[in-house]
Amino acid sequence: MHNSEATETIYKEIYQLEPAHYMVITKNNIVKNKYWNPLKDVKPLKLKNHDEYVKRFLEIFEEAVKCRLRTVGQVGIMVSGGLDSGSIAAIASKELKKEEKVLKGYSFLPIESYSNKIVNHRIADESEYVNILKNYCGNLDITYCRNDNINSLTNIDELIGIFEQPIKTLENSYWVTGMAKQSSEDGVKVLLIGQNGNVSISFGDFFIHIQTLIRQLKFGEVISEVNAANKRYGKPKKAIYSTIISNAIPYKIKKIRHRKEDTIENKFEDSVIKLDLIKKYNVEERFDKKGYNSVITKVGTLKETRKSILDEATLAHIGIMETKDSLAYGIIKRDPSKDKRIMEFCLSIPSEAYVHEGEERYLIRSSMVGILPEEIRTNWRNRGIQSADWVERLLPDWDKTKNQVKEALMDNEVKKYVDIEKVEGLLEKYDDISNCQNRNEVKLILIPLVFYKFIKQYREMLDFQYDI
């Protein structure tokens, strides 16, 4: 997130229109209206059985994919070994085959020296599953993007220019833009993505489902779901119930119990902004209102979760980044999992359509029978993780990077915003990052450097304007 409010930008007195709004400007006034409000307008959908939900979902999903394939050029997709991009790829490749076109897939690979292939059921190298998908679809051409000799800072000046602001998502910068560039060079005009899938087509969190059942007083179903999850995943019932009880404690009580930990210092531990600025601009209060940076775990019901899914600041951030990325590389990113019809359907169905007999992401898994290979559809244990090697990529140039950070910390503008002492402490701690234990702290070291690079670009732009 680069902004906490949907209308904010980093530029003083420059604002942006919120998602799902339109503005009419006349010489007399400015009128702004919200034209899409699904939490208010979308009614609950109750069908006879799960098969009916699957049938309705597939009708909408297939059309959402199909209508995004229109282009005079090639169609590509950012594909992993997971459910979201895999489902989109399976349907898109089938449709393109009718037009005698091939779907061009682009998949991330970590550098060859990266050794942690699977950590805590997260897979860094998903090529095994991507190859399974490729062979199953038969109309999917895969280009693996390892992006050797590229790290999070290599193209950072270019990215700052594209996005017109400092880049916070450093971990993803080198492979996301790398794929966009490669696909553009290959003649791709439409690049499919499945970024929104986790909150739409493949939504389905076990503990959110349990919270929903508890709120509905369906305790018998809670017991059944716990028993099923125990059998499916092998997790002890005691551990499952312990988490359920912890989640069920009202948030206000949790705040009282953990008031010593619920401090501004802890909330902004993962930030290098000066605390006095955070206080000056009421950032803590604004974040609390939106549920950002909470040190206390809060698991809501499905209804409560849907409010956060439609957070306007988040949607604005995603939309702006995708649009500017697309404009820079001459492609159009299209996300079928963010289709308006898909979102409305997914916001209308009951919790049991998403989680069933302990199985998470049940809607997409049950809908993709015969469409996705079973190795992907029934992969309950492992999930992919992109950018797993981002710190390792920094190693060859780390000494140079540290010197650049030190230079940034000397800049007067940077000093106004950044907690210099905190960053200097992290620099001392991570003089060597070969055995890094906390990757987020390495990211905190880099953020002042990225900010400094933005400031330098801004100064150069002003100097150019004055010269003219």
Q: What residue spans do the PLM features occupy?
A:
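Cysteine-centered catalytic environments shared across enzyme families
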Residues: 1-148, 155-162, 177, 449
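Adenosyl-5′-phosphate
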Residues: 12-19, 29-30, 187-188, 247, ...
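Active-site catalytic microenvironments for nucleophilic, acid-base chemistry
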Residues: 67, 91-98, 182, 186, ...
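Short, solvent-exposed loop/turn segments at secondary-structure junctions
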Residues: 83-85, 110-113, 148-152, 196-200, ...
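Short secondary-structure boundary/capping segments
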Residues: 120-123, 159-162, 204-215, 463-467
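Mobile, glycine- and charge-enriched loop segments
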Residues: 149-173, 177, 265-288
